[in-house]
Amino acid sequence: MFLFTRKYKPLLGLDITTSSVKLIELSLAGGQYRVEAYAAEPMPVNSINEKQIVDTEAVGEAIRRAVKRAGARSKEVAVAISGDAAITKVIQMPRNLRAADLEAQVELQADQYIPFPMDEVSYDFEVLGPSEKDNDSLDVLLVATRTENVEQRQAAVTAAGLTAKIVDVEAFALENACKLMTHQMPDGGIDRTIAVVDFGASSTTFSVLRALKVIYTRDFAFGGQQLTEEIMRTYGLSMEEAGRAKKEGGLPGNFQAEVLDPFIDDMTQQVSRSLQFYLASGSGR
């Protein structure tokens, strides 16, 4: 279940990917966030396939190792599903509805926008504010996913001895993170269009935010794994050896010119292509 608007005591932020699990624990004092604990642990091979958790115990064990390495104290966790596993839709609701009536009305209408049987779906909603389309209506963000996507993450977190309090969507988690960085943005990010590139092991997500809201996102199959594989081919290393060399160094002197620079060029072209797709989509208008 998504829990956009509810407040909890500090949680562990958990990023579960095909290559690793990353964890962070923050505290808030005097209006400033402070990192209390963080860690990253490699994900066992084949425990996640195409963003689906297929080995709950292996993922849970990786999470447990990350918690131990970080020395994190909280036992409650926020996780997220990928954007392509979620359905999002802004719908309009009468402005004069009470909170309980609004929830009932969303429940009645949700099946119009969700192409799955409702008993197989987890969904939640958030009121965005007055609608620009109709003065008598509210814009309401409806978000849904197959329940199995939520349960997979809950089960892995439970296997690690933790409790999943929030199951979010990565794009909305990105929005929330960007809101914490406004002091580093021109004009505090207000009325600004900002691109964010989330560079992963096997895929990269290119997102565009306007006024700190995601208005465009594109995933493409390119990531650090390509660099690892090129190191393997060039120097005759195993996957494990190449991954270690990539992180710790010690590669021959021609690594920069022969391997790294061409990889960076490819990465730059991929990001540039995503920017062109965004401009052509009309989302920027």
Model-inferred region functions:
Residues 14-21, 82-84, 191, 196-203, ...:
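A short acidic Gly-Thr/Ser loop motif
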Residues 233, 242-285:
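Adenine-nucleotide phosphate-binding core of ATP-dependent small-molecule kinases
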Residues 76, 80-182:
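Active-site neighborhood for divalent-cation/phosphate handling
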Residues 7-8, 58-71, 180-192, 270-279:
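Phosphate-interacting basic helix/loop segments used at nucleotide- and nucleic-acid interfaces
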Residues 1-109, 151, 161-163:
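Non-catalytic, solvent-exposed interaction/assembly segments
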Residues 48, 148-176, 213-253:
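Glycine-rich phosphate-binding loop plus the immediately following alpha-helix
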